[in-house]
């Protein structure tokens, strides 16, 4: 039902709720839809609708995620909420539900807890650009000084993970009071105030089409009399006939010119993000290009072999490994369209990684791959997915 109602004439932004178990993430999600429904910006959902999150698969991993959508005066939002902590870890690492920003929910009665810390760290590692805070359950705290103490703790915690803790907006309220229609100051008004901070503080993401051109190579053909065609789906940006492009990854970077773009056997002047195209390359031989490389705007992306990853390792039940792995483990890393072998080094003081763990790993690939921070990958053994990861930092 809700699908027809939204006019896509506002800028779109993807957000989510993060924070410790039982601090009120799902209740807040419900409260936002209920309050915004009053002005026609959402379809009201109750807690049970959101909590019964459907399963979905991302990079071979099953994740439970609930999606709701709503709009404010300024923007249209897709909002993701996960039922369990493991779902958050998997979601953020696989990028199944992209987050342009997140609402960190902290209970005023408890203050920051272990998963509060872990979700902030994950947000930092996977590159969530901005966070705002909703301090929930203030109806359970009578002492104003205690609220100030919790706020100070949250700000210090955010700063310790390189978020601007002093500047991040913190809204105090109670999602439950908002749903029950109680005291509007901590109920409805707090939800509207929170949405204003989300509108104002979370930056509008670049649309894929506005970013520098990038297309992972899926296949290569040679067409007699015309040259070499590489096919794939354009991930970002635009490529125009006559423009210079680079072929990056696996071997030395090559420069060439795009002499044609084809889609559905029709010739185009340009291809753009989302299009499945064939790109004709001038003077490039069939054997100069292979699957796993990328075609890109010159200088926009570089090949690397060493990086720091944040990874989630599947449990046995999820089809992953049955046993832990140790330092010098050599699986395949599946980037975009191809597998590359890499060596994992565990961090100082970490003896092994168990199935179901998420951890920071140092990785060295045997061949360079075009990468930047935030690139997602799967960890595989003989074609079977055993984990998922994201490039947190490039080393060389």
From Swiss-Prot:
CDD domains the UniProt entry points to: EF_Tu, EFTU_II, EFTU_III
A Pfam entry, by short name: GTP_EFTU_D3
Membership in a protein family: Belongs to the TRAFAC class translation factor GTPase superfamily. Classic translation factor GTPase family. EF-Tu/EF-1A subfamily.
Top EC category: hydrolase
G5: region residues: 174-176
UniProt-annotated stretches for the region G3: 81-84
Chain spans, region G4: 136-139
UniProt catalytic activity: GTP + H2O = GDP + phosphate + H(+)
Record gene name: tuf1
Annotated positions binding Mg(2+): 26
Compartment(s) where it occurs, according to its Swiss-Prot or TrEMBL record: Cytoplasm
Chain residues that bind GTP: 19-26, 81-85, 136-139
Coiled-coil regions listed: none
EC id: 3.6.5.3
Annotated Gene Ontology cellular component terms: cytosol
Protein name per Swiss-Prot or TrEMBL: Elongation factor Tu 1
Record flagged with keyword Metal-binding: yes
InterPro entries, A to Z: EF-Tu_GTP-bd, EF-Tu_GTPase, EFTu-like_2, EFTU_2, G_TR_CS, P-loop_NTPase, Small_GTP-bd, T_Tr_GTP-bd_dom
Domain tr-type G: 10-206
């Amino acid at each position: 039902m809700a699908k027809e109602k939204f006019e896509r004439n506002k800028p779109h932004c993807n957000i989510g709720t993060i924070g410790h178990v039982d601090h009120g993430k799902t209740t807040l999600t419900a409260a936002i839809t209920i309050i915004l429904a009053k002005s026609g910006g959402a379809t009201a959902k109750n807690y049970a609708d959101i909590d019964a999150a459907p399963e979905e698969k991302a990079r071979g991993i099953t994740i439970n995620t609930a999606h709701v959508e709503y709009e404010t005066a300024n923007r249209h939002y897709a909002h993701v909420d996960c039922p369990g902590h493991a779902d958050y870890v998997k979601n953020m690492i696989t990028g199944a539900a992209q987050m342009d920003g997140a609402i960190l929910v902290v209970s005023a009665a408890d203050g920051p807890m272990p998963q509060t810390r872990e979700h902030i760290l994950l947000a930092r590692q996977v590159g969530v650009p901005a966070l705002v805070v909703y301090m929930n359950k203030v109806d359970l705290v009578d002492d104003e000084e205690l609220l100030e103490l919790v706020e100070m703790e949250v700000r210090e915690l955010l700063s310790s993970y390189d978020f601007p803790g002093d500047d991040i907006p913190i809204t105090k309220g109670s999602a439950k009071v908002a749903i029950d229609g109680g005291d509007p100051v901590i109920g409805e008004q707090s939800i509207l105030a929170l949405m204003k901070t989300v509108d104002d503080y979370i930056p509008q993401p670049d649309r894929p089409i506005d970013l520098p051109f990038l297309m992972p190579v899926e296949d290569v053909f040679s067409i007699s009399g015309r040259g070499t065609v590489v096919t794939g789906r354009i991930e970002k940006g635009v490529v125009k006939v006559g423009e210079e492009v680079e072929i990056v990854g696996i071997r030395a970077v090559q420069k060439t010119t795009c002499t044609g773009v084809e889609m559905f056997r029709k010739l185009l002047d340009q291809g753009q993000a989302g299009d499945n195209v064939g790109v004709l390359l001038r003077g490039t031989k069939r054997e100069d290009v292979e699957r796993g490389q990328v075609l890109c705007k010159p200088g926009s992306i570089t090949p690397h072999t060493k990086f720091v990853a944040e990874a989630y390792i599947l449990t046995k039940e999820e089809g992953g490994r049955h046993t832990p792995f140790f330092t010098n483990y050599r699986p395949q890393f599946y980037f975009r369209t191809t597998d590359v072998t890499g060596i994992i080094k565990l961090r100082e003081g970490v003896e092994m990684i168990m199935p179901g763990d998420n951890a920071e790993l140092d990785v060295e690939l045997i061949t360079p791959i075009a990468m930047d921070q935030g690139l997602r990958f799967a960890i595989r053994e003989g074609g079977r997915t055993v984990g998922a990861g994201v490039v947190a930092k490039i080393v060389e």
